[in-house]
UniProtKB/Swiss-Prot annotation:
Coiled-coil zones: none
Keyword field: ATP-binding, Ligase, Nucleotide-binding
Residue intervals passing through the bilayer: none
Binding of ATP, residues: R86, N87, N88, E223, L224, G272
Subunit structure: Homodimer.
Alphabetized PROSITE patterns for the sequence: AA_TRNA_LIGASE_II
Molecular function terms, GO-annotated: ATP binding; lysine-tRNA ligase activity; tRNA binding
Protein name: Elongation factor P--(R)-beta-lysine ligase homolog
InterPro entries, per database record: Aa-tRNA-synt_II (IPR004364), aa-tRNA-synth_II (IPR006195), aa-tRNA-synth_II/BPL/LPL (IPR045864), EpmA (IPR004525)
The organism's taxonomic lineage, starting at the top: Bacteria, Pseudomonadati, Aquificota, Aquificia, Aquificales
Pfam families in the record: tRNA-synt_2
């Protein structure tokens, strides 16, 4: 099987998995009037000529906003395989342009999506055993202590472990400096699901009992998927997005917030298809001859 045959087989198996589970495949715009407000992700800004006027548009960093607008209207399980774009990303596992699988399950939570992902990984790789641990447990395993709750104590941890940081960095930035050291050790004996993120890292996940109902999937130290139980309260969504928009000086999509007025309870997940395909081929870096321009 050559590279093109392998891709054709792989992508059809992924698509068949969701079709057989009753998901509806959708297609949404790549070019948006407003950027995704994903923390730590830089959107690609473009200028276009529309109806004779120069306008600023944004290439989506994920299809989340458009898919949730569909969810609020149709209230059914949906999935999409699409190209997404993230500025200033290049490396062994990063490209500015890459394929993303995203799906939403109505009436379900993040634990349901974890079970679905287990089934997909079993179908593609034959995996039968999985590990599910909390972020707190992962920190204790790697650093010998739990997650520091203050900036000062997080800096002390980083200093003790010889991890570089800047004095002016906030808690979230400091956390991810430590988290990089944790994640590179995950998923070597079996795929690892890291669950229950600190509330401060909730993104648009529902928060219960002091933590975000959110997970990430790792295989061989590579992050493959990120999912959560969706926060459906429009006022809570507005509060979080306004905070992020102000911090990054980016415009806010009011229609996206309004869509949450009719949003069903659901859970959503995004998965890096190019990374998963590379692992499917037995590679631990992106198959560059297939994904480069």
């Amino acid at each position: 099987m050559d590279l093109l045959d392998a891709w054709d087989y792989f992508i059809n198996e992924v698509r068949k998995f969701f079709k057989e589970k009753g998901y509806t495949e959708v297609s949404t715009p790549l070019l948006l009037d407003f950027p995704n407000l994903d923390s730590n992700v830089e959107p690609v800004k473009v200028e276009v000529l529309e109806r004779g006027e120069n306008k600023v548009k944004w290439l989506h960093t994920s299809p989340e906003y458009s898919m949730k607008k569909l969810l609020s209207r149709y209230k059914r399980d949906i999935f999409q395989i699409t190209k997404v774009f993230r500025n200033n990303e290049w490396g062994r596992l990063h490209r500015i342009e890459f394929h993303m699988l995203e799906w939403y399950a109505v009436g379900c939570d993040y634990l349901y999506l974890i079970e679905e992902l287990k089934q997909l990984l079993n179908k593609l790789f034959g995996f039968k055993e999985f590990e599910v641990i909390t972020v707190e447990e992962a920190f204790k395993r790697h650093f010998g202590e739990g997650i520091p709750q203050e900036e000062s104590s997080m800096k002390e941890l980083l200093e003790r472990k010889g991890i570089d940081f800047s004095e002016d960095e906030d808690w979230e930035t400091l956390f991810y400096r430590a988290f990089i050291e944790v994640e590179r050790h995950l998923g070597f004996n079996r795929p690892t699901f890291l669950i229950n993120f600190p509330e401060r890292l909730c993104a648009l996940a529902k928060v219960r009992n002091g933590y975000a109902e959110r997970f990430e999937l790792f295989i061989k130290g590579i992050e493959l998927a990120n999912g959560w139980t969706e926060e459906t309260n429009p006022e809570e969504v507005r509060k979080r997005l306004e905070r992020e928009a102000k911090k990054r000086n980016l415009p806010l999509d009011e229609d996206f917030i309004k869509a949450h007025e009719d949003m069903p309870e659901c859970a959503g997940c995004s998965l890096g298809i190019d990374r998963l395909f590379s692992l499917f081929l037995g590679k631990e870096e992106l198959v560059s001859e297939f994904f480069r321009a």
